[in-house]
């Protein structure tokens, strides 16, 4: 994995065929045979380009321009600010709270099996946790990642939120915090609240723990991919992190491992949507349908270590299946908090987090 400068350079916008796209706040419309897809940068960009974008271009004879700017919340803010015409045709990595807002504000297209025939194969859970203004193409869950060189395996979320009893002063300055624009931060705060009897309806225990944890935090970032250099250079030893990137880093010989602590975890549905003002809606729907094709699901999820968006794929390697949501039984054990509640409270939680961390 590259150092910080290389990671940043890879996060520049990729023109998957020819040329390059500058990424202002709103991207100018392109030709009808060009599709603009928004998604994450760093290793995610490398993987989706290889496993999904390049095969899609070959199959449909089109060009895909990849825009790697912004988190899910930030990209929905672009959709809102542009009244549904942000310059990208596919919002490739939203989450259920953004889909709920998109439905309420009428800024995301409703997607049915007519537009995306592969919808018939998705998990039933996907239909329950997200409105039809998007499609769940993959899943992750909140994991606790630790540096195996310096720390024993954490047993509880308390080992992160109150690290002194388990690890002593040696871990001070080696924790990372994520800003609430990243749903990773929100989920970790919910687990903090649960440690003290709270939850989404009572987050005060989380704020108390965050205030006490603050002196132990060495770095704070927004995007998940921005954390990679800190894991690699031995600066961060303990972090809440998405299972997919955790598995990717383990597979690429970072000195880390990840676990689901004894209190359990929260699942994340990774969703794709089409803004109402998208310039190339037909091709956008084709791209979302293509992401759900079995071969594409297999290639992408194996490479990124995320869980599939459909339960009918069964030929997973044993080591992959052991840490992924691949059966209805495993899906039933994952908690998905009320996304409508999260969406309504997220602004308040963000302001509280900023107040404590400033």
Predicted regions and their residues:
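A ligand-binding cleft/hinge motif common to bilobed small-molecule-binding domains
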Residues: 97-101, 232, 237-255
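Extracellular/periplasmic bilobal clamshell ligand-binding domains
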Residues: 317-358
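Mature extracytoplasmic/periplasmic domains
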Residues: 275-334
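Early extracytoplasmic/lumenal segment of secretory-pathway proteins
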Residues: 32-100
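Periplasmic-binding protein-like
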Residues: 139-140, 208-213, 221, 250-276
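A bilobed periplasmic-binding-protein/Venus flytrap-type ligand-binding module shared by bacterial periplasmic
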Residues: 143-150, 191-196, 268-281, 288, ...
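Extracytoplasmic ligand-binding site segments that recognize negatively charged/polar headgroups
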Residues: 42-49, 72, 87-88, 93-218, ...
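N-terminal secretory signal peptides and thylakoid transit peptides that target proteins
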Residues: 2-21
